[in-house]
UniProtKB/Swiss-Prot annotation:
Pathway: Cell wall biogenesis; peptidoglycan biosynthesis
Binding site for ATP: 146-201
Chain ranges of the ATP-grasp domain: 116-315
InterPro entries: ATP-grasp (IPR011761), ATP_grasp_subdomain_1 (IPR013815), D-Ala_lig_Van_CS (IPR000291), D_ala_D_ala (IPR005905), Dala_Dala_lig_C (IPR011095), Dala_Dala_lig_N (IPR011127), PreATP-grasp_dom_sf (IPR016185)
Chief location category: cytoplasm
Molecular function per GO: ATP binding; D-alanine-D-alanine ligase activity; metal ion binding
Name of the molecule in the record: D-alanine--D-alanine ligase
Organism: Pseudoalteromonas atlantica (strain T6c / ATCC BAA-1087)
Length: 318
C-alpha cells in the first residue's frame, strides 16, 4: 500500500485482514512504551472496523494465536523479543503473517553495531565508533578511546531501544562508568563519536519516505525522558530542510533501510553536523506509535490520519 493509497481507506477491504492480534507489552525494557503504542493502534483498528484484539506475549503463549484462530499479527513490541527477529522467526514457523521487517532485517536493525558495520561496508555515512565487550573490557583503555573518538562520546547498549542505557560522556572517568552501566543491558556496547549538530528522523512506509522531522530538546541529548516524558522537547515537521537536502535524506534513509533488509515500515535516525553532512544513527523496525511518537507525526504531514497509518501498517503483513 503506497502513501497515496493509504489515504483512501474506503478502498481497503477490511474483511480481508480477518482476525488480527495486535501484539504489545512483552518483557523487554521498553514494555511500557510498547503498551502505549499497542493500545493506540488497537483502538484505531477497532475504530476502522477491523476484528482486532490485544495480545501480550508476557501473559499469553504464542500457540494461543493458532488456538484462538488469529489470521495475522500486527507487531507493536519494542525491543528484545519483538524487534530482534526471534518473534518473527517463531511466527514464520507458525505460518502466521506478521507486519514489517522479517527475521534477518529485524536482527540486524536491533543490533546497532551490526547495522553500522553493514552501512560502513557499503560506504553509507555513519559516525566513527568502537566496541566495548564485557568479556575483556578494561577501564584503563578509556583515555585512549576518548582520544580516538573525540571530546564527546555516546555510549549505547548494542541492542536496546528508546535510548535506554545510553549516556553522553566527555572524559575517561565518565566513559568507564557509562560503559559499566550499559553492560547492565547488553554484553556489547557501542562507543560512538558524538556528532554536534541537528537530529533528524525519516519515517518509511512501503518503500516511500515521509517528510523528515527535526527534534530539539534542552536536555543533554534526545534520551528516554526527552522522547516520552518531557514537555520541552520540540518536533518540527516539515523539518525545514531545503528541498535538495530533504531529497538526499529521504534517499539515504531508504538506502540504509534496504541495506539492513528492512521492509514494510520503519524509521531511520540521523545526525547532521555543522557542515551539513548527514550521519546514520540507527534503523527502527517497530517504531513507537504513542501520542509522542514520530511516525504518526510524519504520516499526518503526509496526509494520513492515525487510523489510516495503522491500517497501512497492518497491510504490510503478508
Amino acid at each position: 500500500m503506497t502513501l497515496a493509497n493509504a489515504t483512501h481507506t474506503s478502498a481497503i477491504d477490511i474483511a480481508r485482514f480477518g482476525k488480527v492480534a495486535v501484539m504489545f507489552g512483552g518483557r523487554s525494557a521498553e514494555r511500557e512504551v510498547s503498551l502505549r503504542s499497542g493500545q493506540a493502534v488497537l483502538s484505531a483498528l477497532i475504530s476502522a472496523g477491523v476484528n482486532a484484539h490485544g495480545f501480550d506475549p508476557a501473559e499469553s503463549e504464542l500457540h494461543q494465536l493458532v488456538e484462538q484462530k488469529f489470521d495475522r499479527v500486527l507487531i507493536m513490541l519494542h525491543g528484545r523479543g519483538g524487534e530482534d527477529g526471534s518473534l518473527q522467526g517463531a511466527l514464520q514457523q507458525m505460518n502466521m503473517p506478521y507486519t514489517g521487517t522479517g527475521v534477518l532485517g529485524s536482527a540486524l536493525c536491533m543490533d546497532k553495531i551490526r547495522s553500522k558495520q553493514v552501512w560502513q561496508s557499503l560506504g553509507l555515512p555513519t559516525a566513527n565508533y568502537e566496541i566495548a565487550d564485557k568479556r575483556d573490557f578494561n577501564a584503563a583503555n578509556c583515555s585512549d578511546i576518548m582520544s580516538r573518538l573525540g571530546d564527546l562520546v555516546m555510549v549505547k547498549p548494542a541492542q536496546e531501544g528508546s535510548s535506554i542505557g545510553m549516556a553522553k560522556v566527555s572524559n575517561a572517568q565518565q566513559l568507564a562508568a557509562a560503559i559499566q552501566q550499559a553492560f547492565e543491558y547488553d554484553d556489547k556496547v557501542l562507543l560512538e563519536q558524538f556528532i554536534q549538530g541537528s537530529e533528524y528522523t525519516v519515517s518509511l512506509l512501503n518503500g516511500e519516505a515521509m517528510p523528515s522531522i527535526s527534534m530539539s530538546t534542552p536536555r543533554d541529548f534526545y534520551d528516554y525522558e526527552a522522547k516520552y516524558q518531557s514537555n520541552t522537547t520540540e518536533y518540527f515537521c516539515p523539518s525545514g530542510l531545503p528541498a535538495e537536502q530533504e531529497g538526499l535524506l529521504a534517499r539515504l534513509a531508504l538506502d540504509a533501510f534496504d541495506a539492513v533488509a528492512g521492509s514494510g515500515w520503519g524509521r531511520v535516525d540521523f545526525m547532521q553536523d555543522m557542515l551539513g553532512q548527514f550521519y546514520l544513527l540507527e534503523a527502527n523496525t517497530v517504531p513507537g506509535m504513542t501520542e509522542k511518537s514520530l511516525v504518526p507525526l510524519a504520516a499526518k504531514q503526509a496526509g494520513l490520519s492515525f487510523e489510516q497509518l495503522s491500517l497501512a501498517v497492518l497491510a504490510t503483513a503478508g
